């Protein structure tokens, strides 16, 4: 009996030790250290650099990818189209999971490729979260550009310790050509870092804060909690969220999921982007007013109305970068604390050449057909 008890005790000790080792492995991931993370900033692009065009989510017609390639050539860059970029699977996906993973791995591991631009969002990146280890995401730091469903990939890169760009995708470049938004994205990739001057908003909460920028499309970002794409586990975060075409109650639900998982406790500030086409089934003045009621409990600054997301203007943001926001009564500033040539951008001066319906922007992003 004593021998059995001793055996059980030893077994319990081994299990406990193994559990501690596993927990330590999780804690040791560098991107859980918040401001101490210091995500690597990929090298800025230069003339002749190769840029991969891949489709991690919904399919994109080859004609749109080719148009984007022409835009990139006009920027002095060399576009390289992923082998499976225009595949179609199950009516919507850009190929099977295996094909999409293959293109991502090709783009990540080819050291001659210096940046990756995603062709379209939609849905599908959540299927890829556990397909590629974080070490592979961070092995050869390079810029990845996209938004909407691509928010998942931004989370993976932040966890891997690499900055990325929340910005315009191929489907929008092909449809709109070169405008102020895409020009700013080009400038950022080439080393001209924006310092945004943002107009005042009635729902702003004044204050100054610095932290690591995380987030993206809220209905993509929130379900990633607890996965290796969850970039909210550090401290001193600046949370950015945007959405399009969702009901108010779904935005409320996703935000409360973030709050109840402690994300807001780890935030130093919040940035609300575009919420175009989101429902108005409640009598709140706006989605910003609805979300402010939760945010104000944390005594952190809130910057509303930043033109990024699914609107006509989608200004580039550096995810995983240290950022400072200063929200005042007369407006706000957003500054990335990374090296590069500075340029001041007054967001009120940035307009789209042609205003497109919400339905069109949703289709281009892959949020609808």
Task: Set out the residue ranges of the language-model regions.
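Bacterial Sec-dependent N-terminal signal peptides
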Residues: 17-35
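Conserved anion/nucleotide-ligand pocket segment
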Residues: 163-226
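ATP/nucleoside-binding phosphotransfer catalytic cores, i.e., glycine-rich phosphate-binding loops
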Residues: 278-369
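Short, acidic/small-residue loops that bind anionic groups at enzyme active sites
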Residues: 134-156, 163-169, 301
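N-terminal small/polar loop signature for handling phosphorylated ligands or for N-terminal nucleophile
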Residues: 84-140
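Internal helical hairpin/lid segments
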Residues: 232-287
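N-terminal glycine-rich anion-binding loop in soluble enzyme alpha/beta folds
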Residues: 29-108, 222
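Bacterial N-terminal signal peptides
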Residues: 8-16
